């Protein structure tokens, strides 16, 4: 709420808070905070990455659409990365169409995008990350794809939910695709 001042709440996973889970608990209550705010751990991971790569980047570029929400989010991300990691973050602001063209061409480092649920089910978020698209960083993982494929065809609601819980954890905790 402090960043956008519009009643927004921080996200602690890919699937938005309030999405249905098992009928008694929400998806977020069942899966917990898979993306908690932890600047110390972020710094540890960054330092490990720099060590493995042999150098730190001189700068990183954050692609953002030219709208007030995207620019506010980008400014916050820039501030966090500068403060926590000491990164030089350049914000590259484009029209929505221009941002889309760069993403389609895979000509970006990382970007601010958003997705709103089409329906009250975690799958509205999770199936976006199958089969590698430029808008999702070309992420493509056979295990993730199998979990989503099984969840889409599963007739046992408990097994389907378990597949989706595992998929979100894989995407966020294991593969660190979404933060």
Locate the predicted segments by residue:
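Bilobed periplasmic-binding protein-like "clamshell/Venus-flytrap" ligand-binding domains
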Residues: 4, 52-69, 114, 155-179
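Second-shell loop/turn segments in exported
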Residues: 26-35, 64-67, 133-137, 148-155
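Solvent-exposed, polar/charged alpha-helical surfaces in well-ordered, non-transmembrane soluble domains
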Residues: 13, 40-48, 72-79, 83, ...
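Extracytoplasmic/peripheral linker and loop segments enriched in polar/acidic and small residues
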Residues: 88-99, 124-179
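Ligand/substrate-recognition segments at binding pockets and active sites
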Residues: 47-117
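Periplasmic-binding protein-like
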Residues: 1-21, 38, 73, 168-179
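Solvent-exposed loop/turn segments at secondary-structure junctions
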Residues: 8-10, 19-22, 66-70, 96-98, ...
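Structural transition elements
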Residues: 10-48, 69-71
């Amino acid at each position: 709420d402090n960043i956008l001042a519009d009643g927004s709440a921080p996200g602690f996973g890919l699937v938005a808070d309030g999405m249905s889970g098992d009928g008694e608990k929400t998806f977020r209550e069942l899966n917990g905070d898979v993306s908690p705010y932890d600047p110390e751990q972020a710094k540890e991971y960054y330092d490990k990455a720099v060590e493995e790569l042999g150098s730190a980047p001189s700068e990183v570029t954050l692609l953002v659409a030219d709208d007030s929400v995207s620019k506010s989010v980008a400014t916050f991300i820039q501030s966090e990365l500068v403060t926590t990691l000491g990164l030089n973050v350049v914000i590259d602001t484009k029209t929505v169409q221009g941002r889309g063209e760069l993403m389609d061409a895979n000509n970006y480092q990382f970007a601010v995008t958003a997705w709103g649920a089409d329906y009250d089910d975690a799958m509205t978020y999770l199936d976006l990350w199958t089969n590698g698209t430029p808008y999702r960083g070309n992420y493509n993982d056979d295990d993730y794809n199998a979990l989503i494929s099984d969840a889409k065809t599963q007739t046992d609601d408990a097994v389907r939910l378990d597949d989706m819980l595992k998929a979100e954890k894989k995407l966020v905790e294991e593969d660190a695709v979404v933060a």
